[in-house]
């Protein structure tokens, strides 16, 4: 039993060892100061290809890719520095080198590959000087990128050109021309071709000046020829220009300069000989007077290409936002990894699966039994080493020669096969795309040629005019329309108020058909476009599921974008947001409307007034401080009046002179209250100190009463509806109100892709809330999805806002938000500013020349104010709600509910006054009764004679004192105390 277990465990160990083989590769990626984005794109595509190959089920090993970034190097030190970097990497060991060579560094790679017998797979075209297959070329370098010399010659012969202008970088001209003429002589010995050479500037900023001078020189030459010729030349002399520049950056810079160049005429025909130009780069030439031809090696309709493109743009979002393609160099680098993996597999099949087992131990290369591989043996200090080449180099190189890959194997650039003598790519195919824009872009002619090496142009070239039928998958070939645009366009849209809506049919009216079924902003826009574009006729249909279009996991698109890509529709006219992701899939016109993401909430109920609403113009803190000030000032006036001698008075009362002070505590409170209520009193301070205190109190009451009056007038006559949130920050920083978006739309993509912390926080909240709701639904018997915050359409989101009693906010475009807020039942509103700025555009398939005419028509309508009129018509002129004042409230007259409190206070004051009067009356009555009772008791008590005489004398003395004081007061010297 134990023996069987040991054997079983050993077999498992062996199997794991077999499936865990990792063969290292090394990629050297050079970056430049001006085009660092391409280097990053190449690295990402290399990693993507590594994962693609390692995921294959029929391969029992993995490739382990290591990348080495090569910084910009000076020409003088490049040989030493690059040689040192490659040899240092070789000490660690790898099975294959991958690189993108150029004319500056090709010789270094060539020397190392030959010297060390280390195969190199190059993702740039071959720079070898050998031309014919009879001469043995370097068997260690293989170029995945094909050379275009044969394609150029075939194209020149197809066009029948005898004179061409060749614009190049200088270093590649001799090799390219020798290859072209060698192939031409082999194919057509009697065909004569004259080439005029021009060297392009090394600085891309000088391209425009170079082209202007070039066009001026060509124009001068043609003028001189016309003057020297005895016959009149009715037609201009054609100028056929071949542009052969190194790298996509320089090629695209040349295109931009050509677009801005002057003196260019319709007789010019520019041919770009590399594969770095895409159809989207030609959008600026639809209305130019020149012809442009490009070579394309991608099949954009291939599912593998679409999937890889989607994965690439997921991991790398820089530098290539204006194209739906992949950088050509990055695509060739991707295929180079597949070639390397396939070659290793072939070598193992031919020489045994264990051929490389002894070469790598613990990720260290052992070459011929010695650790590492040294370009310079003396650098190994640990042992005496002789120079030795890579022992498996020739076997791997021979395996590369046997590699045959197609798009079924995952390649992006079609069939890959190498010439066994030259190492160049052979038996490849390409597509030639030629644009001949006319004055009316709707009649622009495109020519497409399918070309295969050794066979030439398939079917003799395929010429067609971009016309659309109801079955848009068919294309009329070889003819021009007899009349402009007699065929109709298929326009796809979605039902979104007020852009596109179904017309209401009144009872008794016939059933609506065709375009008459719809109304709305977009329908009116289509009518205006039809009036301004000759022959523009259309049929409108609704997108299945009312979907705008989002990219699927396999790289395909649904919704309106999907209809455009599969050519079921020609144009998409709807509130379709222009986004970076959609721009890669389709072409957009100029925006016909600008909007942004906004917040929709349920309109709060009108503010209810309580009986103490009159106190709300001032905050509670102000009321407390005012009341405290009242008592404080009253006490202050009382104290300063008590201590100030100038506030005292002498009064004659009951026959006596007494010193009195009118500002008792009771009178001080009354005086201060009267001043606060803007009323007068019969007492005023006489002392300076009392007047200072009173003046400050009067100033205080003036400001308080004036402010209160102003706020009270606005407060009581304005009905405010205070929203629970006023900005996106308020929404994100609370958890009582849920919020969501339309699932799969551009708004959801905005939050998902945003790098703004606030928006990332909101997206994470929406996702986590949805997951919690799904878990609750799984546990629920009803399994209802009505509580989910993500909705399938705008209509569902708006309805959710209306039925959630203020507990749900919907994030949507401002246009729809404003429209719904102005429609019955008038219970929604927009809050806060827009989160971003978006544009709605008309979408067409990439390369459709109709886009240019749409752009011109939209700009014309915008300048004439027609687009603004449409907006006013559908948003404001047909509004059903009272918009009210701009500050969020509506002005109205006072009603009892707003001022009921003051009536209650008045009534309470009157009742309190009467109650107080009653208490005072009872108190006084009781006091008088007690006084009468006391006097009665005194009068009834008999007095002794001695006591009676004493009382009489005291009374006489008191009268005498009063007379004396009266005489003193009447004298001139009498003064106040």
Curated annotation (Swiss-Prot):
Signal peptide boundaries: 1-19
Membrane-topology annotation of the record: Multi-pass membrane protein
Glycan attachment positions: 36, 227, 291, 427, 532, 566, 783, 895
Membrane side Cytoplasmic: residue ranges: 643-695, 920-977
Known function: L-glutamate acts as an excitatory neurotransmitter at many synapses in the central nervous system. The postsynaptic actions of glutamate are mediated by a variety of receptors that are named according to their selective agonists. Required for response to mechanical and osmotic stimuli.
Tissue localization of expression: Command interneurons of the locomotory control circuit (AIA, AIB, AVA, AVD, AVE, PVC, RIA, RIG and RIR) and motor neurons (AVG, M1, RMDD and RMDV).
Cited InterPro entries: ANF_lig-bd_rcpt (IPR001828), Glu/Gly-bd (IPR019594), Iono_Glu_rcpt_met (IPR001508), Ionotropic_Glu_rcpt (IPR015683), Iontro_rcpt_C (IPR001320), Peripla_BP_I (IPR028082)
GO cellular component: plasma membrane; postsynaptic density membrane
The gene coding this protein: glr-2
Entry-linked PANTHER family: IONOTROPIC GLUTAMATE RECEPTOR (PTHR18966)
Predominant subcellular localization, coarse grouping: membrane
Similarity annotation: Belongs to the glutamate-gated ion channel (TC 1.A.10.1) family.
GO terms classed as biological process: modulation of chemical synaptic transmission; synaptic transmission, glutamatergic
Pfam family, one: Lig_chan-Glu_bd
Name of protein: Glutamate receptor 2
Subcellular location: Membrane; Postsynaptic cell membrane
Swiss-Prot/TrEMBL keywords: Cell membrane, Glycoprotein, Ion channel, Ion transport, Ligand-gated ion channel, Membrane, Postsynaptic cell membrane, Receptor, Signal, Synapse, Transmembrane, Transmembrane helix, Transport
């Amino acid at each position: 039993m134990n023996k069987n277990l040991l054997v079983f465990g050993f077999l498992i160990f062996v199997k794991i060892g077999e499936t865990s083989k990792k063969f290292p590769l090394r990629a050297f990626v050079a970056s430049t100061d001006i085009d660092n984005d391409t280097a990053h794109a190449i690295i990402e595509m290399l990693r993507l290809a590594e994962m693609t190959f390692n995921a294959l089920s029929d391969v029992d090993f993995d490739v382990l890719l290591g990348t080495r970034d090569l910084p910009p190097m000076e020409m003088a030190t490049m040989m030493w520095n690059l040689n040192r970097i490659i040899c240092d990497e070789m000490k660690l060991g790898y099975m294959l080198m991958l690189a993108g060579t150029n004319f500056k560094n090709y010789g270094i790679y060539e020397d190392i590959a030959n010297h060390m017998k280390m195969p190199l797979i190059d993702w740039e075209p071959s720079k070898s000087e050998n031309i014919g297959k009879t001469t043995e070329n370097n068997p260690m370098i293989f170029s995945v990128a094909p050379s275009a010399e044969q394609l150029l010659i075939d194209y020149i012969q197809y066009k029948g050109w005898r004179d061409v202008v060749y614009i190049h970088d200088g270093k590649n001209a001799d090799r390219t021309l020798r290859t072209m003429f060698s192939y031409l002589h082999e194919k057509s010995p009697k065909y004569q071709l004259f080439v005029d050479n021009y060297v392009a500037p090394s600085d891309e900023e000088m391209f425009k000046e170079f082209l202007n001078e070039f066009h001026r020189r060509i124009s001068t030459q043609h003028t001189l020829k016309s003057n020297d010729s005895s016959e009149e030349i009715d037609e201009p002399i054609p100028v056929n220009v071949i542009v052969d520049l190194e790298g996509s950056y320089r090629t695209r810079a040349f295109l931009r300069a050509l677009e801005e160049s002057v003196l260019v005429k319709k007789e010019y025909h520019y041919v770009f000989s590399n594969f770095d130009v895409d159809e989207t780069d030609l959008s600026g030439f639809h209305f130019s007077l020149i012809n442009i031809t490009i070579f394309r090696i991608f099949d954009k309709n291939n599912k593998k290409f679409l999937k890889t493109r989607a994965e690439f743009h997921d991991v790398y979002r820089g530098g290539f936002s204006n194209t739906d393609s992949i950088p050509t160099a990055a695509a060739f680098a991707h295929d180079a990894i597949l070639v390397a993996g396939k070659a290793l597999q072939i070598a193992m099949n031919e020489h045994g699966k264990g051929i490389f087992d002894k070469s790598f131990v613990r990720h260290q290369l052992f070459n011929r039994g010695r650790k590492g591989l040294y370009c310079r043996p003396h650098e190994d200090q640990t042992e005496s080493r002789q120079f030795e080449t890579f022992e498996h180099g020739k076997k791997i190189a021979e395996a590369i020669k046997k590699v045959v890959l197609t798009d079924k194997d995952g390649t992006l650039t079609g069939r890959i096969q190498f010439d066994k003598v030259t190492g160049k790519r052979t038996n490849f195919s390409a597509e030639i795309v030629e644009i001949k824009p006319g004055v009316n872009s709707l009649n622009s002619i495109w020519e497409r040629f399918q070309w295969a090496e050794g066979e030439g142009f398939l079917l003799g070239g395929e010429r067609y005019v971009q016309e659309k039928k109801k079955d848009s998958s068919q294309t009329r070939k070889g003819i021009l329309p007899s009349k402009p645009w007699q065929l109709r366009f298929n326009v796809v849209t979605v039902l979104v108020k007020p852009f596109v809506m179904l017309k209401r049919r009144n009872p008794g009216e016939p059933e609506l058909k065709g375009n008459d079924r719809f109304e709305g902003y977009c329908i009116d826009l289509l009518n205006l476009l039809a009036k301004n574009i000759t022959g523009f006729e259309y049929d409108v249909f609704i997108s299945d599921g009312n979907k705008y279009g989002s990219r699927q996991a396999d790289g395909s698109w649904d919704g309106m974008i999907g209809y455009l890509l599969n050519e079921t529709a020609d144009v998409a006219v709807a509130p379709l947001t222009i986004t970076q992701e959609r721009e890669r899939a389709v072409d957009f016109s100029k925006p016909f409307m600008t909007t942004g993401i906004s917040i929709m909430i349920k309109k709060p109920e009108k503010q209810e007034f309580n009986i103490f609403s009159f106190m709300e113009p001032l905050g509670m803190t102000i009321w407390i401080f005012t009341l405290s000030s009242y008592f404080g000032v009253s006490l202050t006036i009382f104290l300063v009046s008590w201590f100030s001698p100038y506030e005292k008075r002498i009064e004659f009362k009951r026959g006596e002179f007494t010193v009195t002070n009118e500002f008792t505590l009771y009178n001080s409170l009354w005086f201060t209250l009267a001043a606060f209520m803007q009323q007068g009193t019969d007492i005023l301070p006489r002392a300076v100190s009392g007047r200072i205190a009173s003046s400050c109190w009067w100033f205080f009451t003036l400001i308080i009463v004036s402010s209160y009056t102003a706020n009270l007038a606005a407060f009581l006559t304005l009905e405010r509806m205070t929203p629970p949130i006023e900005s996106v920050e308020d929404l994100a920083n609370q958890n009582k109100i849920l919020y969501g978006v339309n699932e799969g739309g551009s708004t959801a993509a905005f939050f998902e892709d945003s790098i703004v912390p606030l928006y990332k926080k909101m997206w994470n909240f929406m996702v986590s809330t949805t997951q919690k709701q799904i878990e609750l639904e799984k546990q629920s018997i009803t399994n209802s999805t009505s509580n989910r915050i993500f909705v399938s359409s705008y209509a569902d989101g708006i309805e959710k806002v209306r039925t959630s009693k203020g507990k749900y906010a919907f994030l949507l475009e401002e246009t729809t938000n404003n429209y719904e807020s102005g429609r019955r039942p008038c219970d929604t509103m927009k809050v806060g500013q827009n989160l971003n700025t978006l544009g709605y555009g008309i979408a067409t398939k990439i390369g459709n020349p109709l886009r240019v005419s749409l752009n011109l028509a939209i700009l014309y309508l915008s300048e004439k104010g027609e687009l603004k009129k449409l907006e006013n018509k559908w948003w404001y002129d047909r509004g059903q709600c009272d918009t009210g004042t701009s500050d969020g409230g509506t002005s109205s007259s006072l009603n009892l509910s707003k001022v009921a409190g003051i009536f209650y206070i008045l009534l309470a004051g009157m009742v309190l006054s009467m109650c107080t009067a009653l208490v005072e009356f009872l108190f006084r009555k009781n006091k008088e009764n007690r006084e009468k009772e006391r006097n009665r008791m005194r009068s009834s008590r008999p007095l002794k004679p001695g006591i009676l005489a004493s009382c009489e004398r005291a009374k006489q003395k008191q009268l005498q004192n009063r007379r004396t004081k009266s005489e003193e007061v009447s004298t001139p010297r009498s003064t106040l105390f």
